[in-house]
Amino acid sequence: DVVLACDVLEHLRAPEDVLQRLSDCVAPMGRLVISVPNIAYAGVVAAMRHGIFDYSDKGQLDRTHVRFFTKRSLEKVLLECGWSPRMWEANRLPVECSELAWCWNALSGDLRQALLAGWQDFDVYQWMVVVTPSADTPAWEVAEARNTADKLRDDLQALSVVHQRERGSLLEHQK
């Protein structure tokens, strides 16, 4: 039993309501497949760096999008609505090939490098995730997954800070 919600949640004012209702549509041990645009895509970040957040007829900033998600924010909503992520897939698109390429190309090479430092998912245009109802998962597994995710996020943030400092020091010594 699989329910598809591909490119749906970003069009809803209250996707939480739909996610909670969908749990009634999925048979025990069933799955929900979700895809959403990634608002943390480097092209969007580059546009915002230029002070631009203009809606368009298609793409990341489609004018019909009323909710925006990063991987982390989608994961949080899913967990809060009783869904457990089982498998993530990243739909990667080089920024230079996107509708936001001009914003990216207008940034200096140094600024692009600074933005990308320690950011492995900069080119994720869309996140896809397979989830199952949390009721099908032992409570300890959900808690363990949350703790592991929180620890990994904290570790990544700490490593990023150290990397930035070391990079800055290296650049300073190269002068």
For each feature predicted by the language model, list its residue ranges.
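Conserved Walker B
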Residues: 8-12
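Short SAM/SAH-binding signature in class I
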Residues: 1-7
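Heptad-repeat positions
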Residues: 149, 156, 163, 167-170, ...
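S-adenosyl-L-methionine-dependent methyltransferase catalytic module, highlighting the catalytic core
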Residues: 2, 13-154
